[in-house]
């Protein structure tokens, strides 16, 4: 467990994000909120079609979610109240600032919804191709400087041992007091 200067508790967890109990689960989404692969597909498969249905309604009403921004739906059958769909950048196409924004806006949205805990995957490291090292560095720096309102606990959920090991090493160097 790590703690940022503002008391935010940060946990690294190796496992399946769809099994985590949290007020919100962050989904690594695309702009059209079409949850067809990776963590997005796993979230809809476990949480139920309602998540995709609400996502479709969101895009119909508000248009595609810009890269670096977030949208919110219910969490269906997941052990959460909400899914925060964060649209991360594609490696080599959109910049690191968009990844920083997607992470920051996810935390901000959790506070806007008065949540105390969220689970977050390694955004943009799947089909969008971001190296774990870059994602971990950006995430650790955003978390280090984030001043929460109601948010108390952030669980970074990593699916593979490789991802977990990289995040642990980088989080140790950036977040260890």
Curated annotation (Swiss-Prot):
SMART domains, alphabetically? A1pp
Question: Could you tell me the superkingdom of the organism this chain comes from?
Answer: Archaea
Q: Give the organism the record lists.
A: Saccharolobus solfataricus (strain ATCC 35092 / DSM 1617 / JCM 11322 / P2)
Q: Pfam families given for it?
A: Macro
Query: Species lineage, top-down?
Result: Archaea, Thermoproteota, Thermoprotei, Sulfolobales, Sulfolobaceae
Q: Where is the Macro domain?
A: 1-175
Question: What is this protein's name?
Answer: Uncharacterized protein SSO2899
What InterPro entries does UniProt report for this protein, alphabetically? Answer: Macro_dom, Macro_dom-like
